[in-house]
């Protein structure tokens, strides 16, 4: 019904409704780094972690149009809680939300152990002010605790990417988001 209503507002032009990661995967396959690739995967990083899979030029959606929920593959059994209700999902570690939580944990551990971190000053001692940029900014300034955060984040991201490559064997894998 939404597509039809939008189409009517746009003088009958065709309107398609698509999940953001699938739309990004289509865009990469149509005009981006995956142009001409038979098999490609797009990983979208943001508040969550999404995925779009292109097989033979078409988006893979699964039987219920919910295929490619890559962020909800488990990479840490019994790990961090995820917004989906499960534990250990890739999204809980490699999304911006996951990065914020990893950063908060490292700051809390630094407090307990007496380690100094410039991230404390950046957030004014208020963990609710941690952002996805906090650790990267502090790491660039030479903060060791922040470097540990970034290493952990990248390790989980790489683990998930390796899983995607091993499962799908894409010609092209792209990562984007906002």
Residue ranges and their predicted role:
Residues 66-69:
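Structural signature of FAD isoalloxazine-binding scaffolds in flavoprotein oxidoreductases
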Residues 19, 55-56:
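A cytosolic small-molecule/anion-sensing beta-strand core signal
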């Amino acid at each position: 019904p939404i597509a039809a209503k939008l189409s009517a507002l746009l003088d009958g032009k065709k309107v398609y409704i698509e999940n953001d990661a699938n739309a990004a995967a289509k865009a990469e396959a149509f005009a981006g780094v995956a142009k001409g690739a038979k098999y490609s995967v797009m990983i979208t990083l943001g508040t969550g972690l999404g995925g779009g899979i292109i097989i033979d030029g078409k988006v893979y959606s699964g039987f219920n149009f919910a295929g490619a929920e890559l962020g909800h593959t488990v990479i840490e059994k019994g790990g961090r809680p995820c917004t989906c209700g499960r534990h250990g999902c890739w999204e809980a570690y490699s999304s911006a939300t996951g990065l914020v939580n990893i950063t908060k944990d490292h700051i809390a551990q630094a407090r307990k152990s007496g380690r100094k971190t410039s991230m404390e000053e950046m957030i004014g001692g208020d963990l609710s002010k941690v952002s996805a940029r906090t650790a990267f900014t502090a790491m660039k300034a030479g903060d060791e605790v922040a470097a540990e955060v970034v290493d952990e984040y990248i390790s989980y991201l790489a683990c998930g990417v390796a899983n995607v490559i091993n499962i799908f064997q894409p010609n092209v894998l792209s990562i984007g988001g906002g």
